[in-house]
Amino acid sequence: RIVALLPRGQAHARFAPKQTVSRPESILLPGLVNAHTHNPMTLLRGVADDLPLMPWLTEHIWPVEAAVMSPAYIADGGELAVAEMLRGGTTCCNENYFFPDVQAATYRRMGFRAVVGLPFIEFPSAWAASPAEYFDKGLEVHDNYRRDPLVSCSFAPHAPYTVSDE
């Protein structure tokens, strides 16, 4: 949180450090933001690589997701992804995947800042059976995290090819 914008001399006088660390061979950067993630899919890394998108999705990813999708799967994949992101300097993500309630709880528990997408898709999943259920459950997740300091929510239609015009 930015608390003041001051000339250097005034800043040093007003906010005198308790300790100074000299790292002449280092650089201090703000945390990076990964603006497009499907973090639980870290557990699917390497599945049918190097295929065109639609065959990859329809013949490989969606069938595997249908077989393994569960709250525990989402939490485990999210935890792994957060560990990997933190190791690389990423401190915030914009997420879009199933079980946003589990994802939000995972990010909160790990102290990781996230915008959790509330998915909309035209086919059933382990999280919701219909567009109306995706919407209703998404609103509930949104309401549960409305004032959370780390986790916020966004509506996240998946893609033009997985949602109707309605």
Can you say where each PLM-predicted feature lies in the sequence?
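Active-site gating loops and adjacent loop-to-helix segments of metal-dependent hydrolytic enzymes
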Residues: 43-76, 113-132
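Metal-coordinating catalytic core of metallo-dependent amide/deamination hydrolases
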Residues: 102-166
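Histidine-centered catalytic micro-motifs
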Residues: 31-42
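Divalent metal-binding segments
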Residues: 2, 24, 28, 51-99, ...
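Conserved beta-strand segments that form the floor/walls of ligand-binding pockets within enzyme
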Residues: 28, 34, 154
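Histidine-rich, glycine-flanked metal-binding segment
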Residues: 1-29
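Hydrophobic/aromatic beta-strand patches that form the interior of the parallel beta-sheet core
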Residues: 19-21, 33, 115
